[in-house]
Design a protein with these regions (language model features):
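Helix-rich cap/lid subdomain of alpha/beta-hydrolase
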Residues: 1-52
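Conserved short-loop catalytic and cofactor-binding motifs
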Residues: 20-23, 65, 93
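Short glycine/proline-enriched coil/turn segments at helix->beta-strand junctions
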Residues: 40, 58-59, 82-87
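Small/polar glycine-rich anion-binding or flexible loop at a beta-alpha turn
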Residues: 54, 95-98
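Short beta-strand/loop motif that positions the catalytic acidic residue
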Residues: 57, 62-65, 69
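Conserved loop-alpha-helix segment in the C-terminal half of the alpha/beta-hydrolase fold
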Residues: 67-92, 99, 104, 111-112
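Short, hydrophobic alpha-helical segments
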Residues: 109-117
């Protein structure tokens, strides 16, 4: 639990033993272990907070779909991206595509920046 947290609110982590096979599948084992050991917690309070009006309703969206993602099913990612009318790029990558395939992710960011000026 973090300092000053309301009662019943905790920090959540992915078990280090599971992290390599779900979040970091496809990455070198040493890198996956390092990422597991240094992961930042998710406050469980975030799981019950309203997010507000989705930005994709008013601004263009881009999505990088990791087709080897073991955290969020690629079909679900694709459905969400289509719902948001996003420009979609698929890459054979795990959940951490920004680490496994930084060139692809960077290119999508650059394209989005150029398109939105």
């Amino acid at each position: 639990m973090f300092p000053g947290a309301p009662a019943g609110v905790f920090d959540a982590y992915v078990k280090q033993s599971l992290f390599p096979s779900c979040f970091a599948n496809g990455l070198p084992a040493s890198e996956a272990r390092m990422l597991a050991a240094t992961q930042e917690p998710l406050s469980t309070i975030a799981l019950s907070q309203q997010s507000g009006v989705p930005a994709w309703k008013t601004i263009p969206s881009w999505a990088v779909i990791g087709t080897a993602d073991h955290v969020i099913l690629p079909a679900e990612q694709l459905a969400m991206a289509r719902h948001a009318h996003a420009h979609i790029t698929e890459v054979r990558a795990p959940h951490l595509s920004m680490i496994s395939d930084p060139g692809v992710v960077t290119q999508v960011i650059v394209e989005a920046a150029h398109a939105t000026g």
